[in-house]
Amino acid sequence: MKTPLITREGYETLKQELNYLWREERPEVTKKVTWAASLGDRSENADYQYNKKRLREIDRRVRYLTKCMENLKIVDYSPQQEGKVFFGAWVEIENDDGDTLKFRIVGYDEIFGRKDYISIDSPMARALLKKEVGDLAVVNTPVGEANWYVNAIEYVK
């Protein structure tokens, strides 16, 4: 189950997407559908069919964003988090082989399209929560346990 948390930046990004879809793209596509429908036979009208499909996709995304944003809890930075891994932290970790990773722990709705973001619900994030620099985090993976050491923790303030 996904945890309904989001960073302020993530919430603003979703809000901008919703505004763009509802105020700019949807009216434009609606005009195209109306124009294509006025041409007559809709069964062989590619413009009509494509734009009608796009309109359904926009409406689906708008419904999802509207419902999703009502339930999300914005988590802002707090000075009490400093020095430990919590939601919103940028974390650099290293394994026994010397491989390093750097990512930010964010909400489920923020991870798409970002390789450097992981969900708070992921096994890695769960293992890292409340750890400090130098601590060992044992992550359960499909092939067994993996050991990762926390090298750095940063917060966007």
Curated annotation (Swiss-Prot):
Necessary for efficient RNA polymerase transcription elongation past template-encoded arresting sites. The arresting sites in DNA have the property of trapping a certain fraction of elongating RNA polymerases that pass through, resulting in locked ternary complexes. Cleavage of the nascent transcript by cleavage factors such as GreA or GreB allows the resumption of elongation from the new 3'terminus. GreB releases sequences of up to 9 nucleotides in length. GO terms for molecular function: DNA binding; RNA polymerase binding. NCBIfam families: greB, PRK01885.1. GO terms for biological process: DNA-templated transcription elongation; regulation of DNA-templated transcription elongation. Keywords: DNA-binding, Transcription, Transcription regulation. SUPFAM superfamilies: FKBP-like, GreA transcript cleavage protein, N-terminal domain. Signal peptide: none annotated. Transmembrane segments: none annotated. PROSITE patterns: GREAB_1 (PS00829), GREAB_2 (PS00830). It holds the Pfam family GreA_GreB_N. InterPro entries: GreA/GreB_C_sf (IPR036953), TF_GreA/GreB_CS (IPR018151), Tscrpt_elong_fac_GreA/B (IPR028624), Tscrpt_elong_fac_GreA/B_C (IPR001437), Tscrpt_elong_fac_GreA/B_fam (IPR023459), Tscrpt_elong_fac_GreA/B_N (IPR022691), Tscrpt_elong_fac_GreA/B_N_sf (IPR036805), Tscrpt_elong_fac_GreB (IPR006358). Belongs to the GreA/GreB family. GreB subfamily. The gene is greB. It comes from Salmonella typhi. This is Transcription elongation factor GreB.
